[in-house]
Amino acid sequence: VQLFLVVAGFAPGFGYDKYTTHIQNGNPYNLTVDMTPFIKINESYYVFGQTKVNWYVAYENCRRLQSELVTFETAEEFDAIAAFLNARGDRSEHWTSGNDLGKTGTHYWFSNAQLVTIKRWAPKQPDNAGGREHCIHLGYIYGYSTEFQLNDRPCHNHASSLFKYICEAPKQETVSIVVWK
């Protein structure tokens, strides 16, 4: 939107009599856009942080990239990320934006304030063990686990709660400006 305002403000100064703008979600013209260090998976872009940190540092690291901790809005998105990690042979645990910091027992995605509704929890999870598990990560939760699942863990520097993290870039928007001279 800021780009539109700047261009619209300068367009008459460049001798354009008429112009129109159009904003579309995504990249409908498949324009080449350098999204480094993000990796495209389906229609979204992700960074897989390699350092093991607590949930708060993971969140800060994503914000430094102008992104958010991953939010699984659909089971398909979760499955695509799990398939990507499996294809790389990565069975590490990764922080998501999910938590119940606002109200214990009610888990929301921090980045969009939506309830966590996907059914990808590990058996008997979330359990808020010890009354201190409030942030959601994905991983092979138990020794017998055969797939990525969600689990709640302490958000802070607990010895067993330092994980890698996944950042998700904001959805792209394409601004088209047509001018007539």
Regions found by a protein language model. Give the residues of each.
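Extracellular, disulfide-bonded carbohydrate-recognition/adhesion ectodomains
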Residues: 1-181
